[in-house]
């Protein structure tokens, strides 16, 4: 979208806002989530809701359904309704730029959660250290499978900062431990795609020793493919620490998961939004803790 078209669209949005019957109250915070069809982002939303309730805000949540066009429409809708501040968990770090710019031109402060925006102005970004998490996952694989292990990496949605950063951290471990990377292929943070991609990769690489999946949903899909193929000796490490992921670790099925704290990301987003609305200074970036979860 060029700037002329964007300016026209924002002008139309601003005009509509004056007649909108659904204009937002001053005590409302808007949250646009990439998808609510993923336990991680449901937890993020729940954390935001809990903090909003605590601070006395009404939280309006819109689901982008992993679709950048839907994401832009959601932000347009919120702009029409006169939102005072926008929390957004991008579907794609590049594609979200138009939505961020739309909010910028309407003078709506933007805070990104979990995934960054590569374009537009953002007042604060709240996320885990995904690079460190990817490195921790790789280091754990080396500890259990050994130096030079034969590994497969299941990547998230191309273009998201989470996928890029987790991959970057894992590549640091690949270099440090001289892994033999048999394949690196996207499965879009999706369990069914993780299953299907892993089935295909197993045909070509039956000698795989370990799998790093950039989220727990893909890890659980890969685990199912390995179980079906009778490959119980292949270790799988996930990322996120979702309830399903941690249960699989405690049941001895997943070797480990890098646990994020999505509820804290959501809560910190609302807390930061509260500060912005009150005119207080906020940091450009707030890191949220993560941890390696293994069976005890």
Curated annotation (Swiss-Prot):
Pfam families per record: Peripla_BP_4
Gene Ontology annotations for the cellular component aspect, listed alphabetically: ATP-binding cassette (ABC) transporter complex, substrate-binding subunit-containing; membrane; outer membrane-bounded periplasmic space
Intracellular or extracellular location(s): Periplasm
InterPro entries: Peripla_BP_I, SBP_2_dom
Domain of life per record: Bacteria
Presence of keyword Secreted: no
Keywords linked to the UniProt accession: Chemotaxis, Periplasm, Signal, Sugar transport, Transport
Broad class of where this protein is predominantly found: periplasm
Signal peptide per UniProt: 1-25
GO biological process entries: D-ribose transmembrane transport; positive chemotaxis; transmembrane transport
GO molecular-function terms, A-Z: monosaccharide binding
Family note: Belongs to the bacterial solute-binding protein 2 family.
Its biological purpose: Part of the ABC transporter complex RbsABC involved in ribose import. Binds ribose. Also serves as the primary chemoreceptor for chemotaxis.
Quaternary structure (record): The complex is composed of an ATP-binding protein (RbsA), two transmembrane proteins (RbsC) and a solute-binding protein (RbsB).
Protein name (database record): Ribose import binding protein RbsB
